[in-house]
């Protein structure tokens, strides 16, 4: 398992010519935050800003030290990626409050936790406002989050499920 922060600044290397095509700046998740949809590599422009990404389908290996890309020509404008309007930037989830279904504050989302195939298995906890099993675990599995919320609304957790499950190591 690896966190989003651990992946920042990892090299993206082309399999075709061994060229470094960029670095992981952040991760775009699919709309349900279950897997990486694209890798954010940078942006340019002030007025007509372009956001550059590599689609997950172009990533061949999600390695420990580098991620391998199928070619050096795989960097595209986010606007040109199908479904990108629903993508969630990983750092946008950091600090988002987590509440129970009844409205009790649990804590805040910390960082993404990914498996070797760039699937989201859970989140670390940033802050915890409760004591007990969840606070000791310092993480929450993705399946325990019923709703990710938004910038203005908290994520909603199934507390019994969160307390009964463990993040893989």
Protein language model regions, located:
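Peripheral interaction segments used for macromolecular assembly
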Residues: 1-169
């Amino acid at each position: 398992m690896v966190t989003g922060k651990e992946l920042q600044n990892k090299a993206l290397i082309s399999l075709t010519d061994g060229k470094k095509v960029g670095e992981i700046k952040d991760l775009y998740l699919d709309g349900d935050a279950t897997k990486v949809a694209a890798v954010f590599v940078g942006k340019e422009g002030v007025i007509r800003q372009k956001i550059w990404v590599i689609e997950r389908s172009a990533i061949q290996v999600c390695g420990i030290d580098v991620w391998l890309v199928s070619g050096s020509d795989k960097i595209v404008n986010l606007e040109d990626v199908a479904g990108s309007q629903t993508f969630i930037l990983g750092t946008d989830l950091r600090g988002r409050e987590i509440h129970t279904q009844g409205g009790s504050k649990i804590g805040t989302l910390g960082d993404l936790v990914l498996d070797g195939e760039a699937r989201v298995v859970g989140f670390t906890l940033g802050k915890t406002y409760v004591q007990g099993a969840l606070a000791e675990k310092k993480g929450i599995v993705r399946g325990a989050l019923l709703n990710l919320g938004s910038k203005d609304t908290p994520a909603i957790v199934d507390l019994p499920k969160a307390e009964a499950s463990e993040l893989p190591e």
